[in-house]
Amino acid sequence: MARYRGPVEKLERRFGISLALKGERRLAGKCALDKRPYGPGQHGQKRGKISEYGLQLREKQKAKIMYGVSEKQFRALFKEANRQEGNTGENLVRIIEQRLDNVVYRMGFATTRRFARQLVTHGHILVNGKRVDIPSYMVKPGQKIEVKEKSKNNPQVIRAIDLTSQTGIVPWVDVDKEKKFGIFTRFPQREEVVIPIEERLIVELYSK
């Protein structure tokens, strides 16, 4: 399955939860899910019983959509998580949180991961002073993530910083909002990552 590029609010209504796909509307409480907390379509309000496999597949789809990754990318992330020592599910969450587009989002330079990905691919982001335009780049502890000098007055970046000031920044990054840079200080602990994903079900799905 390729990366989803259609109407994102329909996806949130289908899953019945916020996937942080509409940043400014979400923060303002104007998402379609807030007004119509049921699935889209004629039979959207009827949620049938889902099989065990269906639940597992649903969790994988939620994670892929939330982080904006393709099936190929997600499978590669899982293989790496499974290769490492420790809990595979927790490894998966930690690894996917290391993606550059996600770190840009977590630092508050973008209201959505989709916009963060655009900032990266269009060359607006520096890692340790060098331009990196690969969203899947794995950020390591101690690395400095910065909005390029010419892009620091980008209205969308400024707006994102203003909006994310309301919600706070995750504890595994330090951010200087005025200078528009941040440090990825450490790997996040699973309990710190607040996402509506049960990674255990994803591990079960890929382990079949």
Swiss-Prot record:
Coiled-coil ranges (or none): none
Keywords: Ribonucleoprotein, Ribosomal protein, RNA-binding, rRNA-binding
Keyword Hydrolase: no
InterPro entries from the UniProt entry: Ribosomal_uS4, Ribosomal_uS4_bac-type, Ribosomal_uS4_CS, Ribosomal_uS4_N, S4_RNA-bd, S4_RNA-bd_sf
Entry's Gene Ontology cellular component terms: small ribosomal subunit
One MF term in the entry's GO annotations: structural constituent of ribosome
Top-level taxon in the UniProt lineage: Bacteria
Signal peptide span: none
Gene Ontology annotations of biological process type: ribosomal small subunit biogenesis; translation
Family annotation (PROSITE patterns): RIBOSOMAL_S4, S4
Chain ranges of the S4 RNA-binding domain: 98-161
NCBIfam families: PRK05327.1, rpsD_bact
Family that this chain belongs to: Belongs to the universal ribosomal protein uS4 family.
Assembly and interaction partners: Part of the 30S ribosomal subunit. Contacts protein S5. The interaction surface between S4 and S5 is involved in control of translational fidelity.
Protein name: Small ribosomal subunit protein uS4
